[in-house]
Curated annotation (Swiss-Prot):
The gene is E2. Binds DNA as homodimer. Interacts with protein E1; this interaction greatly increases E1 DNA-binding activity. Interacts with protein L1; this interaction enhances E2-dependent replication and transcription activation. Interacts with protein L2; this interaction inhibits E2 transcriptional activity but not DNA replication function E2. Interacts with protein E7; this interaction inhibits E7 oncogenic activity. Interacts with host TAF1; this interaction modulates E2-dependent transcriptional regulation. Interacts with host BRD4; this interaction mediates E2 transcriptional activation function. SUPFAM superfamilies: E2 regulatory, transactivation domain (SSF51332), Viral DNA-binding domain (SSF54957). It comes from Human papillomavirus 22. Residues 284-293 have a biased composition (Basic and acidic residues). Keywords: Activator, DNA replication, DNA-binding, Early protein, Host nucleus, Phosphoprotein, Repressor, Transcription, Transcription regulation. Residues 195-209 have a biased composition (Low complexity). Residues 1-201 are annotated as: Transactivation domain. HAMAP family: PPV_E2. This is Regulatory protein E2. It is found in: Host nucleus.
């Protein structure tokens, strides 16, 4: 047991020295995978003999150690084969020789120069997927020699030239069937539109040829392209609904129905207010007409004083916490019974809770939420966890992750927006709910 722990500690020291050295050559990367293989062998031996911990390190299961040891052996063989090629003298980092990089598309190839490509399905900036493509790809031929080629992107997907053939390792058509409806998409590299669908030459989804790629959009499409880029990356006010609507017909129908619903709601609220106003005037006139008859023995005096006091209290409360005229009648929610008076219920029901919707990568939003809660404590009401939209028939996530931040008032929201510093790639938009 003690000798096994000593060997494990010595192995850990060698790994730490290798990480701290930062040497970027192929020999160091081969040595790294040899040490990882020895580590898994020690874990496997310890588990077979009932040892569950080596120092402070818990021992994994036999299946886990065996699988990782096989991965280390396979990576060592690949690197030793690459060492015999003409690319052995190039700099190689731990990331470029990691198992995750080698297994990512195209699999079993070494890659360098990652770039991010965004694809807008149906031309909708909200229905976007991000892909990682590579500038240089090293693939192994049938005679176990290595070739270095450049990676390319076209309308069909990401590919590289293997001999005289196009080899696509990413096809946008696959996700277009899942997330899109029209069978068209736009390819954006470095925030610029590189490829857009051409109606006269672009085949529908499922008919596109593997080796044929449409030409880039003509110069006449540049105004539209610039407006799309501005809409995608610039801050913008939210539409009446904050949901992402993928279907074009459904989006048009909701755009037509939303103003109608608001007009109906406001007309109902105005009619109710007018009816309430007439009822109040009738009751006051009736009381004023009956007060002389009821106040014969001094009864009219106390009645008049009590009515004037109630009027003054009502006027003071309305002036102190009133609601703007354009905010009245903009809600359909029901108010709970936690309020003490009818006036407090009316003020609370007069407007909707304002929110901000943030869109971005899941990890970026999680880190920002942690910083936001510490820095802006007390300046907002609630903040949600990260969530995503899913399709109507599948559970696959659509687009990027989202977070909602609610506020007590619009002024509180505007003040917080002025102080917020959003990370790169995170966008925001306004929103309101009937209730939270």
């Amino acid at each position: 047991m003690e000798k096994l722990s000593e060997r494990f500690s010595a192995l850990q020291e060698k790994l730490m020295d290798l990480y701290e050295s930062g040497v970027e050559d192929l020999e160091t990367q081969i040595q790294h995978w040899k040490l990882l293989r020895q580590e898994q062998v020690l874990f496997y031996y310890a588990r077979r003999h009932g040892i569950l911990r080596l120092g402070y390190q818990p021992v994994p299961t036999l299946a886990t150690s065996e699988s990782k040891a096989k991965d280390a052996i396979a990576m060592g063989l690949l690197l030793e084969s690459l060492q015999k090629s003409q690319y052995a003298e190039e700099p190689w980092t731990l990331v470029e020789t990691s198992l995750e990089t080698v297994k990512s598309p195209p699999a079993d190839c070494f890659k360098k120069g990652p770039k991010s490509v965004e694809v807008y399905f149906d031309g909708d900036p909200e229905n976007v997927m991000s892909y990682t493509v590579w500038s240089y790809i090293y693939y192994q031929t049938d005679d176990e020699s290595w070739e270095k080629v450049e990676g390319h992107v076209d309308y069909t997907g990401a590919y590289y030239i293997e001999g005289t053939f196009k080899t696509y390792y990413i096809k946008f058509e696959t996700d277009a069937k899942r997330y899109g409806t029209t069978g068209h998409w736009e390819v954006h590299v470095n925030k610029d539109t590189v490829f857009t669908p051409v109606t006269s030459s672009t085949p529908p989804v499922g008919v596109a040829s593997q080796n044929s790629a449409p030409e880039p959009a003509s110069t006449s499409d540049s105004p539209q392209r610039s407006s799309q880029v501005t809409h995608r990356y610039g801050r913008k006010a939210s539409s009446p609904t904050i949901t992402t609507i993928r279907r074009q017909k459904r989006r048009e129908r909701q755009r037509q129905e939303t103003p109608t619903r608001r007009r109906k709601t406001r007309s109902r609220s105005r009619s109710t207010e007018q009816r309430g106003g007439r009822a109040t005037r009738r009751s006051l006139s009736r009381e004023s007409a009956e007060s002389p008859r009821r106040g014969g023995r001094g009864g009219g005096g106390p009645l008049t004083r009590s009515r004037s006091r109630s009027r003054s209290r009502t006027r003071e409360s309305v002036d102190g916490g009133g609601v703007a005229p354009d905010e009245v009648g903009a809600t359909l929610r029901s108010i709970g019974r936690q309020h003490s008076g009818r006036l407090a219920q009316l003020l609370d029901a007069a407007k909707d809770p304002p929110v901000i919707l943030l869109r971005g990568a899941a990890n970026t939003l999680k880190c920002y939420r942690y910083r936001f809660r510490k820095k802006h404590a007390g300046s907002f009401q609630f903040i949600s966890t990260t969530w995503s939209w899913v399709g109507g028939h599948t559970t696959d996530r659509i687009g990027r992750s989202r977070i909602l931040i609610s506020f007590h008032t619009d002024r509180e929201r505007e003040k917080c927006l002025q102080q917020m510093k959003l990370p790169l790639g995170v966008e925001w938009s306004y929103g309101q709910f009937d209730d939270l």
